[in-house]
């Protein structure tokens, strides 16, 4: 039986398309906000499809999980870099957001791998109740991730326009009001990620040291 080419699995091909769309978005961000945001949101939307494809085709892989997470982190980070350029007074907040996002996911993934999980989304159900809901409820996970990305995307668009009026309020401004609490909640969950992962790593270190005594 011929060896399977993991790199050509359908979910991973979708992942490559996400990267291409994200790069196109970054290229247009300085000059063409609607083109840039369309490609950015398309890249994010495909994130939902690669997971469905992986489950439907039985093509879930460690490489695919890593590709998915890295694409998410890098795309968000690049958008935040652009936001820091557009809103220089808020640069520190964007820097903190980037640092928290990358650090929390990396440490959580690393602690999951060390503990023997195949993916950062496979958690011990006896662990933190907030993370348990976050990773076992697909609607909750989708709402928080999509709302967070939409908040930053709307903040980018808001720099250029308030959007079409809905009553007396611009659509982009209204969208920011709706998604801001979601983005804040996502940041709180990232802090929980970081603290929980740090405790897990410390517990593993303590167990290893106890074995050596």
Curated annotation (Swiss-Prot):
A CDP-1,2-diacyl-sn-glycerol binds at residues 51, 55, 61. Its EC number is 2.7.8.11. One of its GO terms (molecular function) is carbohydrate binding. Catalytic activity is higher with Mg(2+). According to PubMed:7998949 the cofactor is Mn(2+), while Mg(2+) is much less effective. Residues 27, 95, 161-174 are lumenal. Induction: Inhibited by PtdIns (product inhibition). Catalyzes the biosynthesis of phosphatidylinositol (PtdIns) as well as PtdIns:inositol exchange reaction. May thus act to reduce an excessive cellular PtdIns content. The exchange activity is due to the reverse reaction of PtdIns synthase and is dependent on CMP, which is tightly bound to the enzyme. The chain crosses the membrane at residues 6-26, 28-48, 74-94, 96-116, 140-160, 175-195. GO terms for cellular component: endoplasmic reticulum membrane; Golgi apparatus; membrane; plasma membrane. Mg(2+) 2 binds at residues 47, 68, 72. Mg(2+) 1 binds at residues 47, 50, 68. PROSITE patterns: CDP_ALCOHOL_P_TRANSF. Belongs to the CDP-alcohol phosphatidyltransferase class-I family. This is CDP-diacylglycerol--inositol 3-phosphatidyltransferase. Its main location: endoplasmic reticulum. Keywords: Cell membrane, Endoplasmic reticulum, Lipid biosynthesis, Lipid metabolism, Magnesium, Manganese, Membrane, Metal-binding, Phospholipid biosynthesis, Phospholipid metabolism, Transferase, Transmembrane, Transmembrane helix.
